């Protein structure tokens, strides 16, 4: 089994979906994971997911497929923040540390593309702290980013954050792939 979460509206997500569907002996399950805005008073407001999926994609409600019980071979997800996003969150059952504990391979692919970043652009490089050093990247077995240049910056950023002795770990798990977009 391969469980894909969130929207497939972006070109690269459709490419990934089709790639997994083309693999022999692979059952692909797509779920739109519930997302919540955090309110100023500390509460949560459910986001009305208006993500449109291509007609050929069947969405399996979270109530109908429980990855905790099914233990899929791979989970592919796009939300790295867990509870570190000040504006929104998902239910903790969908946080990366839980996902990682219930699959053979956890794969993170960013839900966005950035412009290519020059490592000398300190503003852009500093901003990478907001999405690179997040739990989803750390807990994943595999991270697919848009280019070799971005891959090198992820490795550099994570190595700076976690220490020189971790560089080989990041280099082994982060790969550049065609994730589409502009």
For each predicted feature, which ranges?
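Donor-nucleotide binding loops and adjacent catalytic segments primarily
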Residues: 182
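Single conserved hydrophobic/aromatic residue that forms the stacking wall/gate
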Residues: 1-15
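Active-site and donor-binding regions of nucleotide-sugar-utilizing enzymes
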Residues: 13-177
